[in-house]
From Swiss-Prot:
This is Tol-Pal system protein TolB. One of its GO terms (cellular component) is periplasmic space. It comes from the Bacteria. The Tol-Pal system is composed of five core proteins: the inner membrane proteins TolA, TolQ and TolR, the periplasmic protein TolB and the outer membrane protein Pal. They form a network linking the inner and outer membranes and the peptidoglycan layer. Keywords: Cell cycle, Cell division, Periplasm, Signal. PANTHER family: PROTEIN TOLB, PROTEIN TOLB HOMOLOG. Its main location: periplasm. Pfam families: PD40, TolB_N. Residues 411-431 are annotated as: Disordered. InterPro entries: 6-blade_b-propeller_TolB-like, PD40, Tol-Pal_TolB, TolB_N. It comes from Burkholderia ambifaria (strain MC40-6). Gene3D superfamilies: TolB, C-terminal domain, TolB, N-terminal domain. Residues 1-26 form the signal peptide.
């Protein structure tokens, strides 16, 4: 959630209804608006035996690769090619494909599916291996995402994030929904439904829980939602505002922003709700905490210098070391997020009357805007650090967008028909 003047929070009240596991009618749709400058040409043949199945694995793989902006899908024709087939790799190279994928989906006696595939390097004329996955009617999409992840890693040397999940808040009419979806916005499920706003969802490192802020008791309270069970529990209901939850890397602790004593300050609380501890001791407003991946530091937003900027302090708090200012490009910077490798800081900077997503190299201090939008908020790194998800406006509507973290390509816009979408958080790698 973007900070407003003096970092005050929006005046929100909510009354919430748990709807765990419900299918979402309004799903996020991905519109590809730009691709990377360097694309890997690949041909993915139709998988054998998938006609008539609930999900077409081949289509999911192709769509994932195209959406990444890193691949060009070469026409592989309509003839299915199983992984057991003899493949003329030279012929596929002649068609412009530097890699070729063959596979099959076979239904087993127990009703499950066995999904097999092989990835070939047509340039070196060799196999790059493959996987044998077990799936059900409801997990065929996941199998497709895992295949795309395998291809991405084998050909680009970086782990793919197609099998990760997103969380975000959709508003349709007067109803708000906290939704959990696949990385492509499909297979969306409702975690929480409300007649009023829901804010600040944050994934646990395990990907099984989401912390968020609810206003159902006429004040902001931090909850944790257990996704496998659909249950939730209260974590912080202190006097005043309870906001901006952020998980520690070991999942044991949440950093939160509380106005317990007046000005909003940074605290930590155990994930079970106990062990409250104050970390900042300033007379200013300190908010939006975020842990470094190694757990040593907490980055946060503070106006202690007169205007909002990003600072860093030891995870034990200012008693263990003074907070140090991190951002110096721009006079108004908020919403810190650290890349999974700890090398980059993403944040929102007020620029020319708008708000833009910036990325800063934490070693050199160099910072650059990476978007062509100007109402940006709520950045979130993909688990591999190669992309950022954020909220913005497009065509007068609140939408999400995904952009390479190096700014090498324009954003992909993610929107929902008939509604607005905000408060994104990109989930971790799934085990």
């Amino acid at each position: 959630m973007r900070l407003m003047t003096k970092l005050g929070f929006r005046a929100l009240v909510a009354s919430c209804l748990i709807a765990a596991g419900g299918a979402a009618n309004a799903q996020v749709n991905v519109l590809i608006t730009g691709v990377g400058s360097t694309q890997f040409p690949i041909a993915t043949a139709n998988f054998a035996n998938e006609a008539g199945l609930p999900q077409q694995v081949t289509s999911i793989v192709r769509a994932d690769l195209a959406r990444s902006g890193k691949f060009t899908n070469i026409d592989a024709g309509s003839t299915p090619v199983p992984e057991t087939a003899s493949v003329d790799l030279g012929a596929w190279k002649a068609k412009g494909a530097n890699a070729f994928v063959a596979g099959s989906v076979n239904r087993e006696a127990n009703g499950q599916y066995k999904v097999n595939f092989i990835l070939y390097d047509t340039v070196k004329q060799q196999s790059l291996g493959g996987l044998s996955l077990t799936a059900t009617d409801t997990t065929l999409r996941t199998a497709g995402h895992k295949i795309a992840d395998y291809i991405y890693q084998k050909l680009l040397g970086v782990r793919g994030v197609f099998a990760t999940r997103l969380s975000y808040v959709i508003k349709t009419g007067n109803r708000y929904q906290l939704q959990i979806s696949d990385s492509d916005g499909q297979n969306a499920r409702i975690a929480l439904s409300s007649t009023e706003p829901i804010i600040s969802p944050a994934w646990s490192p395990s990907g099984t829980k989401v912390a968020y802020v609810s206003f159902e008791r006429k004040k902001p309270i931090v909850y944790i939602h257990d996704l496998p069970t659909g249950r939730r529990y209260m974590v912080s209901d202190q006097k005043g505002n309870n906001s901006a939850p952020a998980w520690s890397p070991d999942s044991n602790t949440l950093a939160v922003a509380l106005s317990l004593t007046g000005n909003t300050q940074i605290y930590t609380v155990n994930a079970n709700g106990g062990g409250l501890r104050r970390l900042t001791q300033s007379s200013s407003i300190d908010t939006e905490p975020y842990y470094s991946p190694d757990g040593r530091w907490i980055y946060f937003t503070s106006d202690r210098g007169g205007a909002p900027q990003i600072y860093r302090m030891p995870a034990q708090g200012e008693s263990a070391g003074a907070a140090q200012r991190v951002t110096f490009t721009g006079s108004y910077n908020t919403s810190p997020r650290i890349s999974p490798d700890g090398k980059l800081l993403a944040y929102i900077s007020r620029t020319g009357g708008g708000f833009k997503l910036y990325v800063q190299d934490l070693q050199t201090g160099a910072a650059n805007a990476i978007t062509n939008t100007n109402r940006d908020e709520s950045p979130s790194f993909a688990a591999n650090g190669q992309y950022l998800l954020y909220a913005t406006q497009s065509g007068g509507r609140n939408v999400l967008a995904a952009v390479p973290s190096d700014g090498s390509a324009p954003p992909q816009i993610l929107s929902v028909q008939g509604g607005s979408v905000r408060e994104p958080s990109w989930g971790p790698f799934m085990q």
